[in-house]
Amino acid sequence: MTDVTGAPADVLHTLFHSDQGGHEQVVLCQDRASGLKAVIALHSTALGPALGGTRFYPYANEAEAVADALNLARGMSYKNAMAGLEHGGGKAVIIGDPEQIKSEELLLAYGRFVASLGGRYVTACDVGTYVADMDVVARECRWTTGRSPENGGAGDSSVLTSFGVYQGMRAAAQHLWGDPTLRDRTVGIAGVGKVGHHLVEHLLAEGAHVVVTDVRKDVVRSLTERHPSVVAVADTDALIRVENLDIYAPCALGGALNDETVPVLTAKVVCGAANNQLAHPGVEKDLADRGILYAPDYVVNAGGVIQVADELHGFDFDRCKAKAAKIYDTTLAIFARAKEDGIPPAAAADRIAEQRMAEARARR
């Protein structure tokens, strides 16, 4: 871990007592003129420069921000490894309410901090930051992706994210039912924002039956008007209890799989775009005990990170789609490893990712 001499005591406590992941570097950033306070955490650069987004969030204190950055950076190492990218994992968090303090001056200052790492960290969008923000950051830092097409970027990544989740569903169907086709399968989608909407399109094109819910009723109404065959239910609680549900796709908030939802879930497969779907590590065992196949979220939702990584080399949609299509094979390999080792799929994915990172370190 990097030297953080002079950091507040609560931050030091978080760094040295909460970091069990062997992070390589943590940078505390402050620019008084713009009001910037940020944390950049690099978990691993074994496979290449750390890649991960910038989260802009009103954390209660610096220690909470550091803890989130450490956790998110570690997650990106595993995601990037399983996506087959030549990138390690990193994450940055900017402390504060973006609605209150986000400014061009602050984003430019942040870009200078990222640039000071000399390419060890490549940033992108995350919660609270958008394509337009990355355009500003890129004015001070060439190690920025997730930019607008007008500024050399690829733009919205929801198309490839949904395509990757769709490939994960096909892999689950192949593993469980011996056939990757989703025709006549019933798929329930919780959250039909940009990613969920595109996922609906893929499923309908293949002849699946689709059931949806979203807290934004106007979004659901627009979707069902456009696709009358789509069935809407009141809420997620109703969705997970739908009779004869084959696949459940959490595509909204994290923690969708928990002690309350798993016991009543009727689906045989869980495969969705939401991050951090498992509320706690014991949930996956609960799923397995009920005979429910779980496709690890960070594997199947990797289409977005595949896109932003490709942007660094001059974005090509067809090349990205071909890479995202490999999520099918990767997911099948995870299920096979899980069966071979007698462990849940998420644990199998972690083992494969750790093996790839260890092999990369050994080659150095």
UniProtKB/Swiss-Prot annotation:
Outcome following mutation: residue 91 to A: Loss of activity
Example of a GO cellular component annotation carried by this entry: cytoplasm
Catalytic reaction equation(s): L-valine + NAD(+) + H2O = 3-methyl-2-oxobutanoate + NH4(+) + NADH + H(+)
Main location as per UniProt: cytoplasm
Pathway participation: Amino-acid degradation; L-valine degradation
Matches recorded under InterPro entries: Aminoacid_DH-like_N_sf (IPR046346), Glu/Leu/Phe/Val/Trp_DH (IPR006095), Glu/Leu/Phe/Val/Trp_DH_C (IPR006096), Glu/Leu/Phe/Val/Trp_DH_dimer (IPR006097), Glu/Leu/Phe/Val_DH_AS (IPR033524), Glu/Phe/Leu/Val/Trp_DH_bac/arc (IPR016211), NAD(P)-bd_dom_sf (IPR036291)
Regulation: Inhibited by pyridoxal 5'-phosphate (PLP).
Lineage summary: Bacteria, Bacillati, Actinomycetota, Actinomycetes, Kitasatosporales
Effect caused by changing residue 79 to A: Loss of activity
Family: Belongs to the Glu/Leu/Phe/Val dehydrogenases family.
UniProt-annotated catalytic positions: 91
Coiled-coil spans in chain: none
Protein name from the UniProt record: Valine dehydrogenase
EC number: 1.4.1.23
GO biological process: valine catabolic process
PROSITE patterns per record: GLFV_DEHYDROGENASE
